């Protein structure tokens, strides 16, 4: 029995996943996490550091790390990469001015060795706002079709209304589960 098989068996008992939420500041990471956890979203302030939520969903324990996206904090993102099973990249669909920067930051992340193999979910948030770009437009602008190193999905969501948030997170969890809880 190989080392990876032993690790998978240990993780299978725990049914635990580590999910990292990243994106530029004001993209809606904290709002998404609170909405997903069933918490009120009326008082949210910028994340100056990180939030950790542990919650149960579909029979799994999810350790969700919401890390601040301000430019001054991005150099610290690498401190959170270890043992990440899923990466949720949150995009502000209404912030056309920073889409190029958003794409550049994502490309840097995808080259990180410690994130190799992590499932990627790109959430195009704020779909409820007038003028928000569609998930297809963002997929094109961010060149997501070029990603071959990760399983990925792009989804248009609204953290405020909850639109498509649950189905997107369910996809992420199912994809991670197939990868880390299935013994070959």
Swiss-Prot record:
GTP binds at residues 23-30, 66-70, 125-128. Pfam families: Arf. A lipid is attached at residue 2 (N-myristoyl glycine). Ubiquitously expressed. One of its GO terms (cellular component) is mitochondrial intermembrane space. One of its GO terms (molecular function) is GTPase activity. InterPro entries: Arl2, ARL2/3, P-loop_NTPase, Small_GTP-bd, Small_GTPase_ARF/SAR. Signal peptide: none annotated. Keywords: GTP-binding, Lipoprotein, Myristate, Nucleotide-binding. Disulfide bonds: none annotated. GO terms for biological process: establishment of mitotic spindle orientation; establishment or maintenance of neuroblast polarity; microtubule cytoskeleton organization involved in mitosis; neurotransmitter secretion; protein folding; synaptic vesicle endocytosis. PANTHER family: ADP-RIBOSYLATION FACTOR-LIKE PROTEIN 2-RELATED. GTP-binding protein involved in protein trafficking; may modulate vesicle budding and uncoating within the Golgi apparatus. Belongs to the small GTPase superfamily. Arf family. This is ADP-ribosylation factor-like protein 2. It comes from Drosophila melanogaster. The lineage of its organism: Eukaryota, Metazoa, Ecdysozoa, Arthropoda, Hexapoda.
């Amino acid at each position: 029995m190989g080392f990876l098989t032993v690790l998978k068996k240990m993780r299978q008992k725990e049914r635990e996943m580590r999910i990292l939420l990243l994106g530029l500041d004001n993209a809606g990471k904290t709002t998404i996490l609170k909405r997903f956890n069933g918490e009120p979203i009326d008082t949210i302030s910028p994340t100056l550091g990180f939030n950790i939520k542990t919650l149960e969903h579909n029979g799994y324990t999810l350790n969700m790390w919401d890390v601040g996206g301000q430019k001054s904090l991005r150099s610290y993102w690498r401190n959170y990469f270890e043992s990440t099973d899923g990466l949720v990249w949150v995009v502000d669909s209404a912030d056309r001015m920073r889409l190029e920067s958003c794409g550049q930051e994502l490309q840097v992340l995808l080259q990180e060795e410690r994130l190799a193999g992590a499932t990627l979910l790109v959430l195009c948030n704020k779909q409820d706002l007038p003028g928000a770009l569609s998930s297809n437009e963002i997929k094109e602008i961010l060149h997501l079709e070029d990603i071959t190193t990760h399983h990925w999905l792009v989804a248009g969501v609204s953290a405020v209304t909850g639109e498509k948030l649950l189905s997107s997170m369910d996809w992420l969890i199912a994809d991670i589960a197939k990868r880390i809880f299935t013994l070959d």
